[in-house]
């Protein structure tokens, strides 16, 4: 099987959806017999310090040109100098960074330009949902033929859950406007 590398900044054991997704993807590829090296990048992404960006570029440039390189979304979205990487790159984009709330207009414009350029640079893009694919196509001009949707999975419980009275709904996710908790609460209020 073709060996690959996966560039992930920060601590892979961080308990966020993105890190859990990437940790499971890395483990799943290895379980299928793929030789996937984990490139451990500095934790400052998506706002890399010059030192972290320099170290990341050195690690990524060391990946041979016959070994695909998967880029975490923080790296694909905020990384500069990626055109110097010889390996064919695949971007793993959970949500485009330029579309986060609370960014200054200058920061949003910078991320938009960087993400757009890097999406055009990579050979392929992995996304967790049709919504992310559609956003990349509409806003960044990404070619939908170069995008694969890899939805996150869940571990099924060993036993069926005990019935609750009244029924309970568990919504898992950071409390963030794009997660749609307001939509859920509005629907439940009806």
Across the structure, where does each feature detected by a protein language model lie?
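Conserved donor-binding/catalytic core segment of Leloir-type glycosyltransferases
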Residues: 126, 161-179, 185-189
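N-terminal beta-loop-helix "entrance" segment that forms/cooperates
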Residues: 42-60
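Active-site proximal beta-strand in glycosyltransferases
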Residues: 68-70, 83-101, 126
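N-terminal subdomain of nucleotide-sugar transferases
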Residues: 1-42, 63-67
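Carbohydrate-associated surface elements
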Residues: 131, 150-153
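Short His-centered aromatic/hydrophobic patch
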Residues: 71-76
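Conserved alpha-helical elements of sugar-nucleotide-dependent glycosyltransferases
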Residues: 17-24, 110, 183, 187
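Membrane-proximal helix-turn-helix segments that form the acceptor-binding/catalytic region
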Residues: 97, 106-127
């Amino acid at each position: 099987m073709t060996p690959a590398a996966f560039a992930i900044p920060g601590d892979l054991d961080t308990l966020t959806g993105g890190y859990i997704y990437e940790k499971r993807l890395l483990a799943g590829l290895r379980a299928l017999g793929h030789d996937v090296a984990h490139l451990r990048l500095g934790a400052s992404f998506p706002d890399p310090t010059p030192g972290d960006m320099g170290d990341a570029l050195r690690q990524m440039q060391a990946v041979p040109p016959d070994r695909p390189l998967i880029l975490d979304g923080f790296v694909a979205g905020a990384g500069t100098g990626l055109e110097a990487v010889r390996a064919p790159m695949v971007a793993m984009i959970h949500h485009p960074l330029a579309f986060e709330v609370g960014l200054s207009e200058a920061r949003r414009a910078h991320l938009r330009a960087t993400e757009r350029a890097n999406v055009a640079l990579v050979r392929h893009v992995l996304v967790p949902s049709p919504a992310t694919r559609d956003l990349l196509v509409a806003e960044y001009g990404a070619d939908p033929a170069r995008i694969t949707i890899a939805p996150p999975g869940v571990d099924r419980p060993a036993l069926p859950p005990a019935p609750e009275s009244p029924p309970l709904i568990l919504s898992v996710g950071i409390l963030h406007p794009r997660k749609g908790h307001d939509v859920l609460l509005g629907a439940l209020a009806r």
